[in-house]
Design a protein with these regions (language model features):
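Secretory targeting signatures
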Residues: 1-7, 209-238
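Typically the conserved alpha-helix immediately C-terminal to a functionally engaged Cys/Sec
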Residues: 1-15, 32-34
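Short, conserved secondary-structure transition motifs
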Residues: 25-26
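Short, conserved sequence motifs used for protein processing/export or organelle targeting and
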Residues: 19-20, 29-65, 71-214
C-alpha cells in the first residue's frame, strides 16, 4: 500500500482507490464482500494465474482496470513505487475519447434512498457494446485493531457492490452500516472487455522466501482515474 500511495501522490493526478478485502472462506477479515471478490476473480483471475499461481495474490493492484500487478514479489514500498508510477503514467484505452458520467443520491432518512446514474458519449457513440456500469460503496476509513497491517486503520474499504442494469437509470437502495464513523461514499464505475487487453504486469521477482506472504487481511487495490463519478452518500453508523 505504501508504494502505491507514494506513486499516486507523486503523480499529482486525482485518483480513486478501492480496497477489496477477502470474503470467501475468510474468518479474520470483517470487511470482505463476496460479490466483489467474485467479480475480481472473474475479471482478473486468469491474468493473475498467468503471472503467479494464484487467482488473487494479496496484495494485488489494478491500475485503471487494465494493468494488473499480481502480488508484491517481496518488494518493499520504495521498490514498488516506480513500478506503480509507470503504470499510472500509461494512457489507458480510449484515453483520447470523452464521455459524461453522472451519479446522484437522494434520501429523506439518510439510509434509504434513490440512486440515479448515466453515461453519455454524444453523437460519437464510441463505447464498446460490452460496456457495463456498477457502483461501489466505499468507507473512507475503518478501524480494526486486530488487523495485520499493524496500524489498525484500513482505508478506502469496499463495503458493497451494486451491479446496475444498463448505463442509465435509477434504483432504490439501502446503505450498509458504516463500520465506524460517518464516511461512506458511492463510486460509479464503467467497464468493458477489450478484444486483446494488456492486463498483466509481472510477475515480480521475489527478493526472499516470503514471496507474496499472504497476510490474514489480504488487500486487492483498484486505482481508477476520475473517469467515472464519485459522491459522498448519506451515511449511518454501525
Amino acid at each position: 500500500e505504501e508504494g502505491l500511495m507514494l506513486a499516486i501522490e507523486d503523480s499529482g493526478k486525482e485518483t480513486i482507490v478501492l480496497a477489496f478485502h477477502r470474503a470467501i472462506a475468510e474468518v479474520e477479515d470483517p470487511f470482505g464482500v463476496e460479490s466483489a471478490e467474485n467479480r475480481w476473480s472473474e475479471r482478473y483471475g486468469d491474468a493473475s494465474l498467468n503471472a503467479v499461481p494464484l487467482r488473487a495474490a494479496a496484495p494485488s493492484t489494478v491500475i485503471n482496470g487494465e494493468l494488473l500487478h499480481a502480488g508484491s514479489g517481496g518488494l518493499d514500498g520504495e521498490s514498488l513505487k516506480p513500478i506503480y508510477a509507470q503504470s499510472l503514467s500509461t494512457p489507458n484505452h480510449f484515453s483520447d475519447k470523452s464521455a459524461t458520467s453522472s451519479l446522484s443520491w437522494s434520501s429523506e432518512d439518510t439510509v434509504n434512498g434513490t440512486i440515479t446514474w448515466s453515461l453519455e458519449t454524444g453523437p460519437s457513440d464510441w463505447l464498446p457494446e460490452s460496456t457495463t456500469s456498477l457502483i461501489f460503496v466505499v468507507e473512507a476509513s475503518a478501524t480494526f485493531e486486530e488487523g495485520s497491517n499493524g496500524l489498525g486503520d484500513y482505508h478506502d474499504v469496499v463495503r458493497d457492490m451494486i451491479e446496475l442494469e444498463g448505463n442509465n437509470g435509477s434504483m432504490s437502495y439501502t446503505l450498509p452500516s458504516a463500520w465506524d464513523g460517518d464516511d461512506l461514499s458511492l463510486v460509479l464505475i464503467h467497464e468493458w472487455q477489450l478484444p486483446e487487453p494488456d492486463c498483466c504486469v509481472g510477475p515480480l521477482e521475489p527478493e526472499d522466501d516470503g514471496l507474496f506472504g499472504l497476510p490474514s487481511i489480504g488487500l486487492l487495490w483498484v486505482v481508477v482515474g476520475l473517469a467515472g463519478a464519485a459522491i459522498m452518500a448519506a451515511r449511518r453508523e454501525r
